[in-house]
Amino acid sequence: MRRTAAFISALVITLMVTLVSGCALSVPEGFNEVKRAKELYDKLDSGRLTMTDLSSGETLMEFSFFINAKDEMIFSYLSQDESGTEGAYSDGAQFFYKNRGEEKWRIISTEDESYLYNLYSKTYRYPYARGSVFFLDGTSVGAAQVTENADGSLTVSYEYDPEKLNKNAVGMLDGVSEFYALSAVYEIAADGCIAAFTETGSVADEQGGRSDVNIRLEVSDPNGVYDIPSPVGELEEVM
C-alpha cells in the first residue's frame, strides 16, 4: 500500500522529534556534516521546500517562506492527495488554513486562544522551515557512505538498522508501530546547507498494515525568496 500525502506529511513532521545526537558515542561517517546542514537550514531567512512521491512522481507538498523586517514569517503551505488539498498561509499578522475535503479557507482571529501559536518568526519557525524536518538518527545507522562531489557538494547515504530504529524511534512516531526498512540520502550543497533529502523504506501503521515510504524533499532558493503570493481563496463566514 502506498502512503498518502497526509500520512507522509505527518510522518515527516513526527520524525522531526527523533533526532539523536549520538551523545559521547562515535557517530557514523558524515553525521556531523548532515547535522550542520540541518542547522544551517534552521537559520535560513527564506527558501522553498518541495516534497515528491518518487513512486508516482506526484508533488505532495509545496512550502515557501521568508522572514520580513519585522521578524514575521510569511509562508505558504499546500499539500494534496486523493482526499483533497490542505493548506496554510500567514501574512505575518494573520493565519489562514484549509482542511482537506473543504472548499473554503478559515482564519484564526486575534480572539482565538491559539492565535499566538500560529504566528511564526525566525526563531519560532513553522515545522517545514526547521532543519529537523530532515530525519537523522546517529544511533541506528547500519551502513554509511559519503561521496565528495566535484562541485564541492557532499552526498551522505545511510542504511538504517530496523531493529535499532524500532528500539530508539518507534515510541516517538505517531502512527508507526514498526520499521521494516529505512534508508536516507542527504545531499549537502557546497555552502554546507542541505539541498535534498531522499527517504525510502517500509513501515507498519498502528493497525499493523504495511506501507512503503518513497519521498524526496528538495530545497530551492535558499535566502532568495522575497515575495509569496497568497493561495487563500473564499473564506468561510465566521458565525
Say what each PLM segment does.
Residues 3-26:
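Sec-dependent N-terminal signal peptides of Gram-positive bacterial secreted proteins and lipoproteins
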Residues 59-63, 83-87, 182-184, 213-217:
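A structural detector for short beta-strand units
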Residues 41-47, 64-75, 88-96, 151, ...:
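Short, solvent-exposed coil/turn segments at beta-strand boundaries
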Residues 102-168, 176:
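Flexible, processing/modification-adjacent segments and terminal tails
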Residues 152-233:
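Gly/Pro-enriched, hydrophobic low-complexity segments
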Residues 18-70, 224-239:
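N-terminal leader/targeting segments and the immediate start of mature chains
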Residues 64-127:
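An acidic-aromatic
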Residues 51-56, 76-81, 97-101, 198-204:
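Beta-turn initiation residues at beta-strand->coil junctions
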